[in-house]
């Protein structure tokens, strides 16, 4: 199998073919996802909650991300692998470059960073130094203390700010964008305004791709279950069938449905 590249996702956007992506944190699940045909995976700082048991993503370190990136890369040698730069790992452009080097050496193809126009110089610096960047707007979990919790973003006037941020990140060189917990109407505007692929989570079925935290897709998240999550394992009965169902529902636009979306 040939390695999946960003140009393949670009082609999906142009051809209006929706694609499914998922978080992965270890060799075994990465291999399972790759075997079933998921070609894009994220080593998310969500591992702070799903793997380490913290109540936020803030305790996650660059070393944690690198460790899990190495494991996932072994399981899915040909996937397009995104890795998060965690909280305070990109406070300055120089710091972002140093930490991006660590996760890229561990096997990432691209780094994901949270934030808007303030990141323009960082995105430019990374891109100029051959580090592909995925932006992340909307509900950015590293900012949980600023937002005062996990809430829908981009309603009202904030929608235009988010769209401007998205355009600024693209102009700076970002090649992908994750849009989290925003109204469907805004997600549609952003997806249509950008030439780069947009991956949604809690952004309706109007984005180019979808991502889910694997624990949400399998219904093994304890406590609060996000509105946008769907337990594919409950319906499918086994993990491989659940992954197949997730992919099929994303590609057909069935998932996320109205019941998983915000307005």
Curated annotation (Swiss-Prot):
**Class of enzymatic activity (EC top level):** transferase
Q: Can the keyword Cytoplasm be found in this entry's annotation?
A: yes
For the ligand (Mg(2+)), the binding residues are 45, 84, 114
Q: Which InterPro entries does UniProt cross-reference here?
A: Pantoate_hydroxy_MeTrfase, Pyrv/PenolPyrv_kinase-like_dom, Pyrv_kinase-like_dom_sf
Mention any one GO cellular component term assigned to this protein in its UniProt record. cytoplasm
Q: Pfam families from the entry?
A: Pantoate_transf
Q: What is its EC number?
A: 2.1.2.11
Note the CDD domains from the entry: KPHMT-like (cd06557)
What reaction gets catalysed by this protein?
3-methyl-2-oxobutanoate + (6R)-5,10-methylene-5,6,7,8-tetrahydrofolate + H2O = 2-dehydropantoate + (6S)-5,6,7,8-tetrahydrofolate
Where does the protein end up?
Answer: Cytoplasm
**What is the UniProt remark on how the cofactor binds and its stoichiometry?**
Binds 1 Mg(2+) ion per subunit.
Q: Which cofactor does it need?
A: Mg(2+)
Its protein name is: 3-methyl-2-oxobutanoate hydroxymethyltransferase
Q: Which gene encodes it?
A: panB
